[in-house]
A protein has these predicted regions:
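Conserved glycine-rich acetyl-CoA-binding loop
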Residues: 92-109, 129-137, 141
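Short secondary-structure boundary/capping segments
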Residues: 6-9, 56-58, 79-80, 153-154
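Class I (Rossmann-like) S-adenosyl-L-methionine-dependent methyltransferase catalytic domain
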Residues: 2-3, 34, 44, 151
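Conserved N-terminal entry element of GNAT/NAT acetyltransferase domains
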Residues: 1-26, 30, 168
């Protein structure tokens, strides 16, 4: 499968989305997020298992995984999408050392364009931990609207997460 090149509007940045392969999954699996963000370390395990068992592109639940490169940096993030009944649920991960560098919004918008071109959905949705205000700010700027909250426990600690949606 060919690499999909996308250029962030108004920037010199060039994002490339490619089907997730084993090398990318292993590299992303080694990322370590600090503090309470460490809960996102676990989120990469299904990605690794999926690529080991089924090869690139998708897992058994129909989630498509992409490795994202930027300019000469071969792996700045992971992006997932799952199409269900007119909605595409996305997952967005940025390499820990790149957080806070104003990459989130252009990266997210380009990922949404890829999902829109692939599935022609009516809506996009995502789930985010409520403590992750940096991500929530990016998602809000991209037009996502906060929705229902759900509680969960990770390593004995209580968290809330919310689903956010926006029209495609």
């Amino acid at each position: 499968m060919r690499v999909t090149d996308v250029v962030a509007a108004g920037r010199d940045q060039r994002f490339q989305f490619r089907p997730m392969g084993l090398r990318d999954a292993l590299a992303a699996h080694r990322w370590r997020y600090p503090g309470e963000y460490a809960m996102y370390n676990l989120a990469l395990e299904p990605l690794l298992i999926a690529t080991l068992l089924r090869g690139p592109l998708s897992d058994a639940a129909g989630v498509s995984y992409y490795a994202v490169a930027l300019d000469r940096d071969p792996l700045i993030g992971v992006f997932s999408m799952q199409h269900r009944k007119g909605d595409v649920e996305i997952g967005v991960g940025l390499r820990p050392d790149l957080n806070g560098r104003s990459l989130g919004l252009p990266y997210l918008l380009e990922g949404l364009e890829l999902a829109r071109a692939r599935y022609h959905p009516q809506t996009f949705s995502l789930t985010v931990a409520t403590f992750n205000q940096r991500a929530i700010t990016v998602y809000t700027r991209a037009g996502f609207i906060p929705g229902p909250l759900k509680s969960f426990t990770y390593q004995g600690k209580h968290y809330d997460e919310m689903t956010m949606r926006r029209p495609a």
